[in-house]
Amino acid sequence: MIDDARAYNSDDDWSLLGSVSYMGSFESGLALVVAVTAAEMFSQGNWQRVYASNNDESLRRGAFLAAAMVFPLVFVMGFLGTVAAGQGGVGDPTIAFFYVIDESNFLVAPVLIVLVVSLVCSSADTLQNAIVASFSRDISDGVLSLKSCRVATIAMIPMAIYLASGPTIIGFEFNALSVFGIFLFADMLAAATVSPVLMALWGKVSSRGAFLGCLAGFSSVALYGLIEPPADSQFYMYIIHPTGGAVPASEGGLTNLWAFVSAIIGSAIATVVGSYALPDE
């Protein structure tokens, strides 16, 4: 398959972007790791698992076991998708993996179906529990009953299914790249605030220092925009489009590593300085 990918892969700019030696692609991939990690720190599903663990050792063992199982699976899936795209026979990137296994052993498909259904059920279960927890604690602060929160979560499912069908609402098209852009914006919000929130567990961090840290997270991204200004956008647009040159993800913009790094580091430094300068009374 690798030989086929090399044979079909054209020698142009897109070939450069797909090269392992091209640092732009590597930085974009690393940026996604940083962005998703920051966003997952706010996931109620993860913290529910932490709370439900028997002890620290069980939590540590479960984390390492999950990582050992997930990493090779994600690596293989991503690699096979890249190989399929390199062969040039896939018009829709979402079916690249299935293009590769089209002529494989007939036992592969049933195994993959079971795996995919299991993954979807697990993700949906975690997501729904997290939404219920967010309604109950974060949004209503315990005012809404658990039953009401569950009903509200179930009521969101038809809207989610409708949005997944790819509609166009007020001129915005809900396709894969557009939704990816929404996720990047959400990840930027998380990256700018995750350091102050987690550092609040440290007793010396004050509430005003944490608040200033959150503001500094966004200011750091804007400062990065002044140092590396986007070609066709304002310097602050990295907050909305954290991609190379602030090009929207729907137009092919690659994730910008340094926008996320500046948000995390800037917010952390401002939190520490602000906490010492403005301690809680």
PLM region descriptions:
Residues 1-281:
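Membrane-embedded helix-loop-helix hairpins and adjacent transmembrane boundary segments
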